[in-house]
């Protein structure tokens, strides 16, 4: 077993083990899982604008302003540099106005401009100087992220959720020989905190929108799996069978290992221009501590979903192996009434 405090996100995703996302894909269909998994040799991991924005949002909320500024730089605004030479044509015009040669490639033209005036306002150089090799983010996106982060930090009882812990902690363990993995948004000494965004285009009460987001995205499976994985890691910390990778305070690690029962909290933030913030605890029992109480149905549903997906993974791995697509082996059958939603019969 491994707990890694420094693993880059790309390495985590490439690691060949079953994750919660994989379990949820399996519950859609085995082929959905295989196509999106490391087993598919033609899988493409496209770094979309949405993914880039999500990483920036997580960096700011989970790790704070300083950590965000170490990685991201706001792209300069062209309106603040009205005389900037942005295109090749701009530089040619600049050279032509000074009766200097203005033909050649962009690199040749740039060199000629700088030879004429080492302080010439070449836009590419302005951007490079301002960003210093960091990831570039537009000012409007950076402002939106900052407003969202401040909305979370200002909420009583929620603002401390992402403090006094560690962000992006990777866990690796086994379930009866099946390699598993999870990546915790934020690990505290006695709690896991997971940051989620949700949309509310239908303008439902926000608590209803959050609950539907949990159901639609099967977050209850995630809550169960993360708690289960962490408990296995903690037992290994006590017995010495869990390997610790990365820089971590020993006192913090000891506190994690000695916590009898970690709690799990989702922090939800609305993502469509209205940064509402809600926090919900995912717990096994109606009364925290579980002293003889009946488990919450949503917890049991998460447990069942996790183990159903895990069992399906093992069946498909045994039947198909890693190197061919996991096409579902189903026979044709007629529809039955229970295949359809009730509103169809109105």
Provide a role label for each language-model segment.
Residues 61-66, 175, 197-200, 231-235:
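Hydrophobic/aromatic-lined pockets within catalytic cores
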Residues 184-209:
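Conserved catalytic cores of phosphodiester-cleaving nucleases, focusing on short active-site segments
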């Amino acid at each position: 077993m491994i707990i890694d405090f420094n693993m880059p996100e790309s390495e985590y995703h490439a690691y060949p083990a079953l994750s919660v996302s994989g379990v949820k894909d399996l519950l859609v269909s085995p082929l959905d899982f295989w196509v999106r998994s490391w087993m598919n040799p033609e899988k493409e991991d496209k770094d979309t604008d949405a993914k880039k924005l999500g990483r920036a949002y997580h960096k700011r909320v989970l790790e704070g302003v300083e950590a965000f500024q170490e990685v991201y730089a706001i792209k300069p605004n062209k309106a603040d540099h009205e005389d900037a030479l942005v295109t090749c044509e701009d530089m040619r015009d600049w050279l032509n106005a000074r009766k200097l040669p203005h033909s050649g490639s962009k690199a040749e033209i740039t060199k000629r401009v700088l030879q004429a005036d080492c302080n010439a306002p070449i836009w590419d150089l302005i951007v490079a100087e301002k960003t210093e090799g960091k990831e570039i983010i537009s000012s409007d996106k950076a402002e939106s992220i900052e407003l969202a982060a401040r909305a979370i930090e200002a909420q009583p009882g929620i603002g401390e959720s992402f403090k006094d812990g560690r962000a992006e902690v990777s866990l690796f363990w086994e379930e009866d020989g099946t390699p598993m993995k999870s990546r915790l948004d934020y690990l505290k000494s006695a709690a896991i905190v997971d940051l989620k965004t949700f949309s509310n285009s239908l303008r439902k009460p926000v608590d209803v929108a959050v609950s539907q987001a949990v159901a639609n995205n099967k977050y209850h499976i995630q809550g169960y799996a993360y708690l289960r994985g962490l408990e296995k890691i903690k037992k290994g910390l006590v017995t010495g069978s869990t390997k610790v990778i990365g820089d971590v305070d020993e006192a913090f690690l000891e506190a994690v290992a000695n916590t009898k029962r970690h709690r799990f909290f989702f922090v939800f933030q609305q993502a469509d221009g209205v940064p509402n913030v809600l926090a919900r605890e995912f717990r096994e029992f109606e009364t925290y501590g579980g002293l003889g109480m009946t488990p919450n149905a949503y917890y049991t549903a998460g447990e069942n979903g996790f183990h159903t997906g895990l069992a399906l993974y093992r069946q498909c791995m045994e039947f198909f192996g890693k190197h061919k697509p996991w096409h579902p082996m189903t026979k044709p059958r007629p529809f039955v009434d229970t295949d359809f939603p009730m509103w169809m019969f109105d």
